[in-house]
Each structure stands twice: as structure tokens, then as C-alpha cells.
Amino acid sequence: MKKFKVLLFFMILFLVACNSKEKTTKTNQVELKKVDFLLDWVPNTNHTGLFVAKEKGYFSEEGIDLDIKQPANESTSGLIINNKAPMGIYFQDYLAPKLAKGAEVTAVAAIIENNTSGIISNKKFNVENPKDLENLKYGTWDIPIELAMLKIIMENQGGDFSKIQKIPNTDDNSITNIANGLFDFAGIYYGWDKIMADELKMETNFFYYKDYAEELNFYSPIIIANNNYLKENAEEAKKILRAIKKGYQYAIDNPEEAANILIKYAPELKNKKDFVVNSQKYLSKEYASNKEKWGYIEAERWNKFYNWINDNDLLKEKIPENSGFSNDYLE
């Protein structure tokens, strides 16, 4: 009987302790605010910092549950401009016609410090600079700004833009089209397509747009947000960007671990691990030369690109000076 009373006493103590612990846990739990965030494309190394921030709990620390999504049929910019999503990833060059028409959207951070896009070509054509592109086949999306970019870098080197043959590029994978001879050169991003070409042992030449026209060192990709969202949720936007910044800073210091985190959230990349790691090693050096200033957009560079668009009448409407970007939400 005495043993039974002792056992009963300890059972009661255990139940009281468990109940107390449960109450404490519920009290300490912070209700997270769910916020949608749209990618521009399939998950890739441009996005690594987002997934690192999610994995490391940086969003949770800010009271945010960031729901990272791929856009379905409508473009990321369209969804954000029309207030169907608050934030997402886009590009300064593609944003130009939207801003010219007065779209209510603002770039709030640059994911990569400098423009890493450029021209890749089959090595057999010995393309060493833009002039060498004469008489070759160009895989194009036939976008006025895109074509003007190629034109200026060719003319800056004494080349004749009219001597290229334009071939419609209907595939996201320009590398395969070059390998198959559909066209001879195309505009790509080094951190994905050039690394992919190297992984496939393709012999190619590459140069950056920015090396042949300083106007073309625009920001790509960028994080954009709906203006009404920013006006009504300024502090929330700062929290999100604070967490994202920490994610990219971690990826800068830990590229291989960051690549593995990306693969965890995008398992379709698992069979391309070596490629993803090499892509990440390249981009981790490109996100920011000073990681404390990750995301910062320089007004001079932003305006220089849009002034070039205005001066060459590439759009019907002009883009106002200093429009479409803000560093106010970065801390």
C-alpha cells in the first residue's frame, strides 16, 4: 500500500510537469505570418539564399512563414503588379517596359551585385569579342531591349549588327540548341548556362555584356514588391529582406552547404549535384563583394541603364529618373 502511494505521488508529479511544459511551449510559440514569395523560374542558384534563410530559421526568427512559390501561367511581375502576390524575383531589363507604363512595383534588393549575363558561342567560331559575331546565327527572343544590347556591344567594337542572322529561340535551354547547331550563339547567364556547358564538356567562348558597354551592367535578378504592399507593410518587408540577406550572406560563406540546401528544397536537382555545387561556387562570389552591402542598388547604375533605353527610344514611354527602386527596406 505504501509503495502504491509513492508510485501514485510520482505519477501525479510527472503529469503536472508535463502539463506545465505543454502550457509553457504554447505560451512561447510565436504565430508566424504567412507571406507569399514568387520565383521567376524553376528553383536555381539565383534563389539559394531564400532556401538557406528558410532552412536556417531566419524567417521564423522574424515571425515570418515565407511561402516560396513558382508562378503558374501568369508572370511574376504581372502577379505582383496586380497585387496578387506581395514580393518576388524579376529582372531590371524586363521591368523596364512595366515601369515606363507606370506599374506600381519597386525593386527592393539586388540578388547579384553585377550583371553576369553575356554571350556564349560555339568555340569553333573563334568569337573573342562582339565584332566576331558577324555572319553567325543568333538565338533571339526578339525583344527590342535584348536586340539593342547586342547591337551596342557589336558597334562598340566596330561590328555590323545587320550581319547577324536572327533565329527564334523557343527553348529555355540555349546550350542544347547551340550544341545541335540550331544557332551559333545566344545570350545567357554565366552562373547557370555557362556552368552547364562546362559540365557537359562543351567547348564554348563567353564574354559579359558589361565588359563591352558599361550601360549594360544592370541588376539581374532583383527582388521586387508591390507598392501598396510596401506602403502598408513596410516593417514586414524589412523583416523579410533582413532574413533573405542573412540567407545570401550564409551562402557567400558556405557555398557547398548552401548548394545542398537548395537541392533539399528542389530535389529535382539531386541528380545534378556537381553542376549545382559548381554553379553555387561561382555565384557565391558574385552575390556581393561586401556581404554587409548585399542587396544594395546603386542609383547611378540603375539610372544609366534606363537612360540608355530612353536615349535610344527602345520603349514608347520614358522611364523617369530614379524610379522603380529603393534601398529603404534593406537593413
Model-derived features: where do they sit?
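Sec-dependent signal peptide recognition
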Residues: 2-9
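C-terminal motif of bacterial Sec signal peptides marking the signal peptidase cleavage site
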Residues: 14-17
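Bacterial signal peptide processing site
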Residues: 19-21
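Short, glycine-/small- and polar/acidic-enriched structural segments
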Residues: 28-170, 177-180, 184-188, 207, ...
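Pocket-lining segment of extracytoplasmic ligand-binding domains
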Residues: 93-94, 173-177, 181-266
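Short, surface-exposed acidic
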Residues: 161-165, 268-279, 316-323
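Secondary-structure end/capping motifs
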Residues: 232-312
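Conserved C-terminal helix/tail region of periplasmic/extracytoplasmic solute-binding proteins
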Residues: 302-331
